[in-house]
UniProtKB/Swiss-Prot annotation:
Pfam families: DNA_pol_B_2 (PF03175). GO terms for molecular function: 3'-5' exonuclease activity; DNA binding; DNA-directed DNA polymerase activity; nucleotide binding. This DNA polymerase requires a protein as a primer. Keywords: DNA replication, DNA-binding, DNA-directed DNA polymerase, Host nucleus, Nucleotidyltransferase, Transferase, Viral DNA replication. It is found in: Host nucleus. Its main location: host cell. GO terms for biological process: DNA-templated DNA replication; viral DNA genome replication. Disulfide bonds: none annotated. Residues 48-68 have a biased composition (Low complexity). This is DNA polymerase. Eukaryotic-type DNA polymerase involved in viral genomic replication. DNA synthesis is protein primed, and acts in a strand displacement replication. Assembles in complex with viral pTP, DBP, host NFIA and host POU2F1/OCT1 on viral origin of replication. The polymerase covalently transfers dCMP onto pTP, thereby initiating complementary strand synthesis. It catalyses: DNA(n) + a 2'-deoxyribonucleoside 5'-triphosphate = DNA(n+1) + diphosphate. It comes from Human adenovirus E serotype 4. Its EC number is 2.7.7.7.
Length: 1193
């Protein structure tokens, strides 16, 4: 029988299992928060206090003494103040519950709070010698973790366990052995003389720096739902489970993140300067192919008058030529390869430097004590030499903050002009004052420069944390919301805000457009060859124009000018300048129109909205959506609250798995000689956005399991259709298995698609391990599929539905209808663009890649690279011949003639393109009689950091997302699949039970939101689908008070004469997005209209109906297919690439040739020579090789 430490300290007990916690006795030792009845207090005061330090005996002594004698002369003593409270015995033990990192199990540690007394009693109980004399109580009470080993060596137990508290509720256990062989010989002899070995183990707890003696350590259980540790049983609330799952659990706490928010508006005092420009290029045959080189640049200045005057003075100072048609328009014309880019770069650098100096001057004027502070604190006589880190420590910063924005604007410049000029103009090393904090946002994407913004920031004295968010709810902001006052230099592309050509954009926004155009082919040939083919007046021949009509129009316009000779360069300059003027007017129109839309249509009069603050229409639409949600929910914080979250890390990929492409495939290949109608869903994504979306923080696993059980019970009832708006079924995203009904019940429009075979296929095969939304579950169930929810820890269930985007869509539809009544083409274009762009912002795909210039890697990126959490995937260097270079005389090096004679002496060692560096004769007055030749050391006016682009990627593949609620895109697509499923019912319900090959053809092609139906399909739409045809009336916006699927279609094939529904009498289908309708015939008036040719990726002007028919017939008969092809000129844009043949920031011209042929790699099974059907059990997908585990009953 061993004597060990137990709960008590007054006896010897054998080693036994711990009886566990005793709640009743523990509660008696706790202090009560409320008042205690008087009898109870009296009993506790009369109880003897044997363990007290002596102070508790004083009241008893006072009660035993007799009261003093009162005399007539003595003043009466004031009544004694009655003490209130509860006298409690100090606790002798503490309890700690934590997770052992070694076993990952939960333990409960009970420890003594008084280390000296606990050690003393323990030694007495076990009849061990007392503590050494040097281990005084005072020394033990002040003992920290650094002296614990010395204590163990002094006590010399058999074994010493040290339990150390770690962050996040963890503990680790280590041991200290005190055997003679492991200790120093002198210490061993000394300890043997002072105290014999203890024959029982000791356990210590280290909390911070404190050391306590452990009484016992027992394993306990841990609740997987709420994280509570317990011995036998416990109760956990829904609130605790929710909090633990989303904030404490290390595995799931980062699955959903709050979406950050800032008001949509800009600061009301923002000063803006717009530099609108356009570039003309010619083709130069270089070492990288046909490279486009700029020879002309025209720019126009607009904005705040003071800033415009500053920019005008700078343009005149740098000797820019002023265009005759406008005093604020300047140009540069030169065929030299780098001259245009260098001149534009010089102007942009000098302009941003002048604006930065102007901002810095106003800061110095507002803080006159800065100069004395810089001299006193940093020993700097000039404040310009301060760094930003030093400047932000300036006390008592004063002044009214300024916010200056410089916009470099053009039409389609991010995909062309900015790339051509990038090697010269991308620079942030302008000579701005040193105290500025310079940051850069550079993001190339899909061959375009999406962001190229540079910010020069100074401290804002008015900045503070906002507590009242009423202004934010109205879309406004003021001085306190900005941490810095700044100068921002931003590149913006009007094409990204209009999605159309400049001429069409001008028409859409009611801007005047000059007639005519320029023969750019002739200009290109003139710069390449020095001449071009022209008539006697110098006017380019017809071969340089698009067609004869364009040739005649432009020649007539030129003759009206009365010029004797055609000046091709001057004409090009005038047309380029006119394009710049139209673009500048478009900039002003966009800025004013969108501000008017936000103020009046959205109802945010205090927003001060600036459309150019964000680069794309998608980013602007998402900002408007967030602002509307913020105004409605009023979260009073800097995020959208817990209602709308963003999936992140593991959940991001899980949610993205539900975002599947649109339906686009033909079910008929060949020539169809029966009537064909085309129906299109009206605003499909907009209508889907008005439907209910998931809302709220996802449920914890326990509540989620209950919701999943409810779902499975409904899915198992195969004979009953489930309502999409059943209040008992919560929205969610699930992993499912699904089996289709009998093949006689299937149709050519499957309700779901799969990527399991490597290609996206709309299939009627069994589904295994697919991720689907709850809307898809209902769609599959109602179509007769048997759906089983597969247990998955990533399964997500939301607490409620909410029409989160309905108000946004309603605002745009109302604005569009009002614009139609007022015939306001501008407002109509804005409302239509914003309505269509929102879905795309939800579906934005994020990754862990980032492209930065070498000099732009901040401290966080450098630490990530050194720690191995960030990898450099590739590095690219700009072309050095695109960078300006100069010879610096101070670094010229002298070469002796004999040294020069040895240079490049062996012709076999040199390449054709490598020419020796130029040699210069020595300057006059060079001493010495020996003839020297000077070879300069050439210096580029760019640092190596400016020349090197790094593509960085995080090692962790999980995406951190706090911007986009991607699950909204998942449900938008799910609602569109529900639309098409209902549409399928109109067409194919009457065919159930008939084999597919025996059914009449009702539809032959589907493309996302459209369906090509035959005459029978048209009749069914006019009867069974009558309520979904727009001309018959109907709603486009979901009504929560009368929940029902809300979508409408309209016939796209309409007569050009009377507007009635028309049909194509003959058509040909070759492949997805490759078809042609011969013509349109109107049954009402009998007129014939022009047909339609759709050929994605091909030159549309080279295709016609007859060519596509011949292509199909040649393929069907086994003839040569190579003659059926189209060619078009293509621009290859390279921004940052690791490919050896692609150089950064180059645009090369190539000829793209595509072969025209019928669909070969089909994603459907063939029924006959023409008809196709989705894959099914009898016609499996040959690409599927995935093995899955199926348990047969």
């Amino acid at each position: 029988m061993a004597l060990v430490q137990t709960h008590g300290s007054r006896g010897l007990h054998p080693e036994a299992s711990d009886p566990g916690r005793q709640p009743s006795r523990r509660r008696s030792r706790q202090s009560s928060p409320g008042a205690v009845p008087e009898p109870a207090r009296a009993r506790r005061r009369r109880a003897p206090a044997t363990t007290a330090s002596g102070s508790r005996a004083a009241p008893t002594a006072r009660r035993a003494s007799s009261p003093p004698l009162l005399t007539m002369e003595a003043k009466p003593l004031p009544p004694a103040k009655k003490k209130r409270g509860t006298v409690v015995t100090p606790q002798g033990h503490g309890t700690l519950q934590a997770i052992d990192v070694a076993t990952n199990g939960a333990v409960e540690i009970k420890y003594h709070l008084d280390l000296p007394r606990a050690l003393e009693k323990l030694l007495q109980v076990n009849r061990a010698p007392p503590l050494p004399t040097d281990l005084t109580p005072q020394r033990l009470r002040t003992l920290d973790s650094s002296g614990l080993r010395a204590l163990v060596l002094a006590l010399r137990p058999v074994r010493a366990e040290v339990w150390t508290c770690l962050p996040r509720g963890l503990v680790s256990m280590t041991t200290i052995e005190a055997e003679e062989g492991q200790a120093d010989h002198h210490d061993v002899v000394q300890h043997q003389m002072q105290a014999p070995r203890l024959h029982f183990p000791l356990k210590f707890l280290v909390k911070g720096t404190q050391v306590q003696l452990v009484q016992h350590v027992h394993p306990v259980q841990r609740c997987e739902h709420c994280g509570r540790l317990y011995k036998h049983k416990h109760e956990c609330s829904a609130r605790r489970r929710h909090f633990y799952f989303h904030h404490i659990n290390s595995h799931s706490s980062n699955w959903w993140q709050e979406i950050q928010f800032f008001p949509i508006g800009s600061h009301p005092r923002t000063e803006r300067l717009f530099l609108t420009y356009d570039v003309e290029t010619y083709t130069w045959m270089g070492s990288f192919g046909k490279q486009l080189v700029p020879f002309m640049l025209v720019m126009k200045l607009s904005g705040d008058d003071r800033l415009v005057e500053l920019a005008l003075d700078l343009a005149l100072q740098l000797k820019w030529d002023r265009w005759h048609g406008d005093p604020r328009t300047f140009y540069c014309v030169t065929p030299e390869k780098m001259a245009v880019g260098q001149q534009f770069r010089q102007y942009r650098d000098r302009l941003q430097t002048a604006l930065a100096v102007d901002l810095w001057t106003s800061f110095l004027r507002a803080n006159p004590h800065l100069a004395d502070w810089a001299l006193e604190q940093h020993g700097l006589s000039d404040p310009d030499e301060l760094t930003y880190e030093e400047l932000k420590k300036l006390p008592h910063v004063k002044g009214r903050p300024r916010f200056v924005e410089l916009y470099i604007v053009g039409h389609n410049i991010n995909g062309f002009d900015e790339i051509v000029l990038a090697a010269q103009v991308i620079n942030n090393r302008a000579e701005v004052p040193q105290p500025f904090r310079i940051t850069r946002n550079f993001m190339p994407r899909a061959g375009k420069i999406l962001f190229n913004d540079v910010t020069f920031a100074l401290p804002n004295p008015a900045y503070k944390k906002r507590t009242d968010f009423q202004l934010w709810e109205q879309g406004g902001c003021d001085d306190i919301d900005f941490k810095h006052q700044f100068l921002k230099v931003m590149v913006r592309d009007t094409f990204a805000l209009t999605h159309t050509s400049l001429r069409k954009a001008a028409q859409a926004y009611a801007l005047p457009v000059e007639k005519g155009c320029c023969a750019y082919k002739a200009v290109n040939q003139f710069y390449m060859l020095g001449s071009y083919r022209a008539d006697q007046d110098g006017f380019p021949l017809e071969e340089y124009w698009k067609d004869r009509e364009e040739f005649l129009l432009n020649r007539e316009l030129w003759k009206q000018k009365g010029q004797l000779k055609y000046d091709i360069i001057q004409e090009t300059l005038d047309y380029c300048a006119l394009d710049v003027l139209v673009t500048a007017e478009l900039v002003a129109k966009l800025q004013d129109s969108y501000a008017h839309f936000i103020r009046d249509s959205v109802g945010l009069p205090h927003a001060h909205f600036n459309i150019f603050q964000r680069p794309t229409i998608s980013s602007n639409s998402h900002a408007i959506f967030r602002q509307i949600v913020y105004r409605a929910e009023k979260p009073s914080r800097a995020n959208l609250g817990a209602g709308l979250l963003a999936p992140s890390h593991e959940l991001y990929d899980y949610v993205r798995a539900t975002i599947r492409g649109g339906r686009c495939y033909p079910t008929y290949i060949g020539i169809l000689d029966e009537p064909l109608y085309v129906y299109d869903i009206c605003g499909m994504y907009a209508s889907a956005l008005t439907h209910p979306m998931p809302w709220g923080t996802p449920l914890s696993p326990y509540e989620r399991a209950l919701a999943v059980r409810e779902w499975q019970a409904s899915l198992d009832d195969l004979g009953t259709c489930i309502s999409y708006f059943d209040p008992d079924l919560l929205p969610g995203i699930f992993t499912i298995d699904a089996d289709p009904p009998d093949e006689l019940m299937l149709d050519p429009l499957p309700p779901f698609c799969s990527r399991k075979g490597g290609r996206l296929c709309w299939t009627n095969e069994p589904l295994r391990g697919e991720v689907a939304t709850s809307v898809d579950l209902i769609t599959l169930h109602n179509r007769g599929w048997q759906v089983r929810i597969v247990p998955d820890e990533l399964t997500t269930v939301f607490p409620e539905w909410k029409c989160v985007a309905r108000e946004y869509v309603q605002l745009n539809i109302a604005a569009k209808e009002r614009a139609d009544k007022e015939k306001n083409q501008t407002m109509r274009s804005i409302a239509k663009l914003l309505s269509n762009a929102l879905y795309g912002s939800f579906a934005t795909k994020l990754d862990n890649k980032k492209i930065v210039f070498s000099d732009q890697m901040d401290e966080g990126l450098l630490k990530g690279i050194s720690a191995g959490t960030v990898n450099i995937k590739s590095s690219s260097f700009l072309e050095t011949d695109n960078l300006s270079a100069e010879v610096m005389p101070a670094f010229e090096r002298e070469y002796l003639p004999q040294h020069v004679a040895l240079l490049d002496s062996d012709p076999e060692d040199s390449e054709d393109e490598q020419r020796p560096a130029p040699f210069y004769t020595p300057p006059a007055g060079t001493p010495g009689h020996v003839a020297y030749t000077y070879k300069p050391i050439t210096f580029l006016d760019v640092d190596e950091g400016d020349m090197c682009l790094h593509t960085l990627e995080k090692v962790d593949p999980l995406v951190d997302n706090d911007r986009y609620p991607s699950h909204v895109a998942s449900f938008v697509l799910a609602w569109t699949r529900a639309f098409v499923s209902e549409w399928s019912g109109f067409l194919y319900d009457e065919d159930r039970g008939v084999p597919l090959e025996d059914r009449p053809i009702k539809s032959v092609y589907g493309d996302t939101d459209s369906l090509f139906v035959t005459q029978r399909g048209h009749e069914l739409m006019e009867t069974r689908g009558k309520k979904r045809i727009k001309k018959n009336g109907g709603k486009l916006v979901f009504d929560p008070n009368q929940p029902d699927l809300t979508w409408l279609v309209e016939c796209e094939t309409v007569c050009a004469h009377c507007g009635a529904d028309a049909y194509a009498p003959e058509s040909v289908f070759l492949a997805p997005k490759l078809y042609a309708l011969k013509s349109l015939l109107c049954p009402a008036c009998g007129q014939t209209s022009k047909g339609n040719v759709r050929a994605k990726g091909h030159a549309a002007e080279a295709l016609n109906y007859e060519l596509m028919v011949n292509c199909y017939l040649a393929d069907a008969q086994g003839a040569d297919r190579e003659r059926f092809s189209t060619s078009r000129m293509s621009l290859k844009r390279t921004l940052a690439s690791a490919q050896p043949g692609a150089h950064p920031f180059t645009v090369t011209e190539t000829t793209l040739t595509r072969t025209l042929r019928p669909w070969k790699d089909r994603t459907l099974a063939a029924l006959d020579a023409h008809r196709l059907a989705p894959y099914s059990r009898s016609r499996p997908n040959p690409r599927n090789e995935e093995v899955c585990w199926i348990e047969m009953p």
